[in-house]
Amino acid sequence: MKLFRYYFILSMCLTVVQLSAQKMKDASVDASKPTNLYTQINSAFEYQSLKNGTHLFGTRINIQYAFNPDNLLLVEVPLLYNDNSKSFGISDTRVRYFHVVKRNITSRFIAIAPFADVTIPSGSFTKGLGSDVWSITAGLVAGYLISPKISMFPGIGYVHVTDPNKYAGSSQNGLNIQTNMSVSFSKRAFLFINPIVTFLSKTIWTGELNFNYMITPNKLKINFGYFPNFTNDISTFRIGTTLFL
């Protein structure tokens, strides 16, 4: 019954987003720059391989609604199966708000945008589907053009992680730094390269390598991504599609 409820709520959200975004359907889409904000629905198949031999796989639904060109709300819901616990269900969900406060500061300094990012422990920790902690990040991203085909979007954020309930541990505060580079091969193909380091009680090194290709300009995109957690020896792979509304 819980799973049905999640699917129902997700379906309602998809319907609302699609109806409210009709006025933006003819907008030109340049998704190679993360500070360009568009209403979109992302759906991906995900596979995770953990150090202890556990494997998780399923789907990750990501809905982004652009209230206007400078404000965007993201909601992400993963539905995963853990082969070790033989459990399927919702994993930790994510909510993110992004606001571009300034664009085109100079010919190369193209944007500055604060953000708030919250990971909600909606997944079951005992079933291996969730982290059992809230993670809250507030920070800033800047956009900088290196060349017509290469741009960088470095970001820095303050991170707070709450006390866990189901295992020994304490709350943590730290810093997250990323250096997201976008490389455009053509008007349709581009690659994100994003090394990330998070300083908490221990330093966590992660990364993103995500190739994107626009099948239908302004409407449909596919992507292939590798998201390693080097510190905890976790490898995540995703194959997905994006529908711009």
Where are these regions (language model features)?
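Cleavable N-terminal export/targeting peptides
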Residues: 1-34
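Transmembrane beta-barrel domains of Gram-negative outer membranes and organellar outer membranes
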Residues: 22-162, 167, 173-245
